[in-house]
A protein has these predicted regions:
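Terminal connector regions
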Residues: 87-115
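Short, hydrophobic/aromatic beta-strand segments
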Residues: 47-54, 106-108
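Short, solvent-exposed loop/turn segments enriched in Ser/Thr/Gly
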Residues: 31-38, 85-93
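Beta-sheet-dominated interaction scaffolds and their linkers
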Residues: 10-40, 115
């Protein structure tokens, strides 16, 4: 805590997660195309960030999380693989659970269309 002019300021201590983007748009892709996309994030907090679980709203989307804690100031990524053999619109949610004090649960979105 810091005191200035009689006011008390406290800074939250702990891991914080900040994603570059909460949505990835595949755009128009062809059946069988590469379905892997990346969500990049940074631990902007003061303690190690642990991604506890990442899951998808559908079995057609397979997320992959970091296996080790992410130190303060470090960057990492959540990899998402969509089954592009499924023709039609892509509208899926990937949920990330972590020990982040600012957002312990985050919903990521993928959109697009497989032709």
């Amino acid at each position: 805590m810091a005191v200035a002019n009689g006011l008390i300021f406290s800074q939250e201590v702990g891991p914080k997660i900040e994603f570059e983007s909460l949505e990835v748009d595949y755009g128009e892709i062809s059946k069988g195309d590469n379905g892997v996309r990346i969500f990049k994030f940074t631990n902007t907090g003061s303690e190690p960030l642990i991604i506890n679980k990442v899951y998808s709203s559908c079995g057609c989307t397979i997320p992959k999380k970091p296996s080790s804690p992410i130190g303060p100031g470090q960057e990492d990524e959540i990899q998402v693989k969509y089954d592009t053999n499924r023709i039609g619109p892509i509208r899926k949610i990937i949920t990330v659970l972590s020990n982040a004090i600012n957002s312990p649960t985050i919903s990521l979105k993928i959109t697009g269309n497989v032709e």
